[in-house]
């Protein structure tokens, strides 16, 4: 197969990684990973390819052996975020299907974009340092040279030495835990389902565990483990049962959740076996567990069946949003599918407004040539991708679509695909005689338009029963002289409050500073532990230029590192008080993950790219 991912320099059309062994020591003093990584690569040519090209970025390579013999290698000039390709000589080439063994002595550097190191002071109980990795989209190459593309999948063995507990994206071999030099332990994990490089994950620190379901545990700091267990245990088993009924049985053995320190930049990262999750889902009210339904859904869409490049990322995220909403509807009731989709529509509108309706990043399929995938990251592949899947569901009917779901995930399990292969799979399935009555409908699908038209997709009719009350309250506020009461939102879910706040954010005329204050006080949005609600409220207060809220915004920006909150808050604070925005960023920049820090710099006009624009 020809290489089709523009975000990799690797020649994966000539060589394909089959197994990866990571023998790494976590060095908290030097803030680096060091050790050896072994790649077993299968030749895909008949001795024509005389070199293996791997992705690398800011990683130190000390030596390389090919089949246990030292070989020539060279790190080429850096090409921006794509990194510096590593060229390794294979003088004799290899027969097609032959597997060669590449052993590399490696060490990460301070420029590594995949790791975050926290001092004991940055953790909750202040007892031990903490380290975690975040490899998506193209950051695995800064951990060790690899074929850093979702179009290549490999099984993994992890042998990780650390003075503190280690979790990794595999199943633990607890019986194999061994003492290493200096009292450190070697933690062994195996991942027997082939996964792409971006799902390689490690974390280490003072970590405790508690069960949250028959196949699931939560891992987090010892002081938080009880509240995390309470937050997640009610829904975990229900989510798993609903997911397995919808697709087919879970293939990964265990499903665990690692709740990370607050500087984790995403809501969740679907690392297999261990979802890495933001602590902002632990809100004390069980209102933000949808993130777990989302990350669990990735066990089928994204992790088992994977988009072949970030250009087709909607195949991961659009499908996952669809499965998440089906799971939530199965557990909480059918109206919650539409309710969540309406919330998502608002996020999609916001993202498209931020980019501009004609921007190429608002297309479903994006040309990534010369583009850093992190720059294109937004709600678009999630929500516009969801609308692509949901459109097909409505077109053929739920009963028929539910038969397609397991067919699709079975056909592409352990493989990667692009949008056209998805299209062909859909057409192939519905070409059966029993679906003859759908022939004209399916022939009318404008695939090219759906894939490449920028801006909002057509909006379907949604069941608004759960949101009508939210819009009604927003209408009262729009009149400008409304006196609020805490009873206005009695019995509302956190998401209903979010819909209401989203409507207020969209008012043509912002609230007055006084109204914004009343809103925060009456509905307990200033003291809430729910960061989703607090952020939505602060965006209203900033637009209202309520200066009494500015310091609260700055404080929150020092407590959370999730980009969903950090980026819009910095953009909004920057509009009303740039000096405070800049001092807040300066004060907290080392708290943020490198990915979040780079994005916030762009939002504040501090990065070299932003200065050029």
Swiss-Prot record:
What GO terms describe the biological role, i.e. biological process, of this protein? peptide catabolic process; proteolysis
Kindly list the GO CC terms recorded for this protein.
cytosol; nucleus
Keyword Hydrolase attached = yes
Cofactor(s) recorded in Swiss-Prot or TrEMBL = Zn(2+)
A Pfam family (short name) is Peptidase_M1
Is-annotated flag, keyword Zinc?
Answer: yes
Q: Would you identify the family this protein belongs to, as annotated? A: Belongs to the peptidase M1 family.
Explain the purpose of this protein: Aminopeptidase that preferentially cleaves di- and tripeptides. Also has low epoxide hydrolase activity (in vitro). Can hydrolyze the epoxide leukotriene LTA(4) but it forms preferentially 5,6-dihydroxy-7,9,11,14-eicosatetraenoic acid rather than the cytokine leukotriene B(4) as the product compared to the homologous mammalian enzyme (in vitro).
| Protein name, as recorded | Leucine aminopeptidase 2
| Taxonomic placement | Eukaryota, Fungi, Dikarya, Ascomycota, Pezizomycotina
């Amino acid at each position: 197969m020809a290489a089709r991912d523009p975000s990799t320099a690797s020649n994966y059309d000539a060589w394909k990684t089959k197994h990866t062994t990571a023998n790494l020591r976590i060095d908290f003093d030097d803030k680096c990973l060091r050790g050896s990584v072994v790649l077993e690569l299968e030749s895909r040519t008949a001795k024509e390819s005389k070199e293996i090209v791997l992705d690398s970025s800011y990683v130190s390579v000390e030596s390389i052996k090919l089949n246990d013999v030292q070989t020539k290698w060279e790190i080429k000039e850096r090409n921006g975020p794509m990194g510096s390709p590593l060229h390794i000589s294979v003088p004799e080439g290899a027969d097609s299907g032959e597997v060669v063994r590449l052993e590399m002595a490696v060490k990460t550097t301070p420029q590594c974009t995949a790791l975050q190191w926290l001092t004991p002071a940055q953790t909750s109980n202040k007892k031990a340092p903490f380290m975690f990795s975040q490899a998506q989209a193209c950051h695995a190459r800064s951990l060790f040279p690899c074929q850093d593309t979702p179009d290549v999948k490999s099984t993994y063995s992890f042998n990780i030495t650390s003075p503190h507990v280690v979790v990794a994206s595999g199943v633990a071999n607890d019986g194999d835990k061994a003492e290493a030099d200096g009292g450190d332990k070697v933690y062994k994990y195996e991942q027997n389902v082939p996964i792409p490089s971006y799902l390689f994950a490690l974390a280490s620190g003072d970590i405790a565990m508690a069960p949250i379901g028959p196949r699931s545990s939560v891992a987090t700091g010892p002081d938080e483990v009880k509240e995390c267990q309470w937050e997640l245990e009610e829904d975990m088993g229900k989510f798993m049962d609903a997911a397995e009924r919808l697709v087919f049985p879970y293939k990964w053995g265990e499903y665990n959740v690692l709740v990370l320190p607050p500087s984790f930049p995403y809501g969740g990262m679907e690392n297999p076996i261990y979802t890495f999750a933001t602590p902002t889902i632990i809100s004390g009210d069980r209102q933000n567990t949808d993130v777990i339904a989302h990350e669990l859904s990735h066990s089928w869409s994204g992790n088992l069946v994977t988009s072949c490049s970030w250009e087709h990322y909607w195949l991961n995220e659009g499908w996952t949003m669809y499965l998440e909403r089906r799971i939530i509807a199965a557990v909480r009731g059918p109206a919650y599918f539409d309710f969540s989709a309406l919330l998502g529509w608002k996020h999609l509108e916001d993202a498209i407004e931020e980019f501009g309706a004609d921007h190429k990043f608002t297309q479903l399929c994006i040309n990534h040539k010369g583009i850093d995938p992190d720059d294109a990251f937004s709600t678009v592949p999630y929500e516009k991708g969801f609308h692509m899947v949901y459109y097909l569901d409505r077109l053929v009917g739920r009963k028929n679509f539910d038969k397609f779901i397991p067919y699709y995930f079975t056909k592409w399990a352990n493989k990667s695909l692009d949008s056209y292969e998805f299209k062909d799979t859909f057409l192939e399935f519905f070409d059966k005689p029993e679906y003859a009555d759908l022939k004209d409908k399916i022939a009318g699908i404008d695939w090219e338009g759906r894939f490449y038209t920028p801006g909002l997709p057509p909006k379907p009719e949604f069941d608004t029963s759960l949101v009508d009350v939210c819009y009604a309250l927003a209408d009262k506020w729009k009149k400008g002289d409304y006196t609020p009461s805490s009873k206005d939102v009695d019995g509302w879910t956190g998401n209903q409050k979010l819909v209401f706040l989203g409507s207020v954010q969209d008012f043509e005329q912002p609230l007055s500073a006084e109204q914004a204050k009343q809103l925060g006080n009456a509905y307990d949005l200033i003291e809430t532990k729910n960061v989703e609600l607090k952020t939505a409220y602060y965006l209203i207060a900033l637009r209202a230029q309520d200066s009494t809220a500015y310091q609260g915004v700055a404080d929150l920006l020092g407590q959370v590192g999730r980009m969903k909150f950090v980026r819009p808050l910095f953009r909004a604070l920057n509009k009303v008080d740039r000096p405070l925005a800049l001092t807040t960023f300066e004060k907290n920049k080392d708290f943020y993950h490198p990915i979040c820090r780079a994005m916030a710099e762009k939002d504040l006009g501090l990065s070299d790219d932003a200065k050029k624009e």
